[in-house]
Amino acid sequence: MAAAAAAGSGTPREEEAPGGEAAASQAQAPTSAPGGVRLSRLPLARVKALVKADPDVTLAGQEAIFILARAAELFVETIAKDAYCCAQQGKRKTLQRRDLDNAIEAVDEFAFLEGTLD
């Protein structure tokens, strides 16, 4: 009866797990959206392996791995767009290493990368 009352009240009801915990507390980061669209282009297992390669990391939650993967995607997208703009200035469509160097020098947010490609 309580399930019917909760369903009819218009408020979402948390499912009880066998241990008595709510299912929402056991939720993991989604890897795909409804309809089969992947939310992360990077393989989460590979990202997790990279994170765990750091000796300072003992535990890495699935949500943290997903957020790191998404942040890496956005970073690569941003630097690639800036490097592509440098390639277009040279009337080229193909990115070259010098385009990345120019993007790193031109954008303040990439200052931490200066000298890393040497």
Curated annotation (Swiss-Prot):
Location of this chain's protein in the cell: Nucleus
Modified residues (Phosphoserine): 25
UniProt keyword annotations, A-Z: Acetylation, DNA-binding, Nucleus, Phosphoprotein
Main location: nucleus
Modified residues (N-acetylalanine): 2
Residues found modified as Phosphothreonine: 11
Cystine crosslinks: none
Stored Gene3D superfamilies: Histone, subunit A
Function: Accessory component of the DNA polymerase epsilon complex. Participates in DNA repair and in chromosomal DNA replication.
Record-given protein name: DNA polymerase epsilon subunit 4
Organism name: Mus musculus (Mouse)
Organism taxonomic ancestry: Eukaryota, Metazoa, Chordata, Craniata, Vertebrata
Gene name for this UniProt entry: Pole4
